Amino acid sequence: MKKFIATLFMAACVQVMAAATVVEESADGKYIIKNSEVTMTIDVNGGKILSYKYGDAEVISQTRFPNSFGSTFWTSPQKEWNWPPVPEFDRNPYKLEKGDKLVMTSEVSQKLNYRVTKTFTANADKSITVSYTIKNESDETRKVAPWEITRVPNDGVIFFDAPIDAITPAGLLDFKPQFGLSWYLADEAQQNRKINADGKGWLAYCANGLLMVKKFEDLDASQPAPEEAEIQVYVNMRKSFIELESQGAHTELKPGAELKWTVTWYLAPFDGKAEPSEALKKKVKSLAKL
């Protein structure tokens, strides 16, 4: 069985070298991390990633739906708060610290008594690491898991390393096994659809000449929160947006304790077609050092 220690994961799993994190403030009050050709724009409201670009090419959906835009962070399981998202984590202003990293810290959630901190760091390989901390501000021992949600356009192909029978509900999204991975070509339907999967610690999306890979800790099937999963893909109805979702281990936190969880983002051009191929698989493994 794979072992997981929340407070040690960041050092044990992510093998990237930090670069100088250049942070600029835009005219409209957003914060932009520049790392060579790669830029990431973060809003202090909700600590949301609103843009992730290679040059002028954008990978995050720029369509704004209520409570469903940009890249955000929630606590899991969702059944503890249902809907809409917890305002202190998803839309209220975060406290900002700038230095060799960009750090944003939320208010304490009135409903859940957690506080979230997000730390953004540029790396020498042009990737950007987002480290999340959940702190238990209650006087009770609690269990919680970290959860990152990123909206992208309904285009291209989504893929990861998991057998088809590890994707549930079976057949809800048309994943196909090819080149040792599971692939889903974006389509549309008249209803919302969502799948869970037990992957291998990474999730990739390719569309419009860009390849994005997100790398995180690889979980055993027993480690996610109840009714949740390491990898989730949500496809909103019609041709609107898709959510790329990843979760960390369901972890017990004593009062005042915290967990840390890290996702490293990679973005690069891809000249081939956005469809299953050995070339796309090789590009992912090279880019994210898998």
Locate predicted features.
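A contiguous, surface-exposed recognition patch within enzymatic or periplasmic domains that forms
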Residues: 31, 38-40, 50-52, 58, ...
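Terminal connector regions
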Residues: 267-290
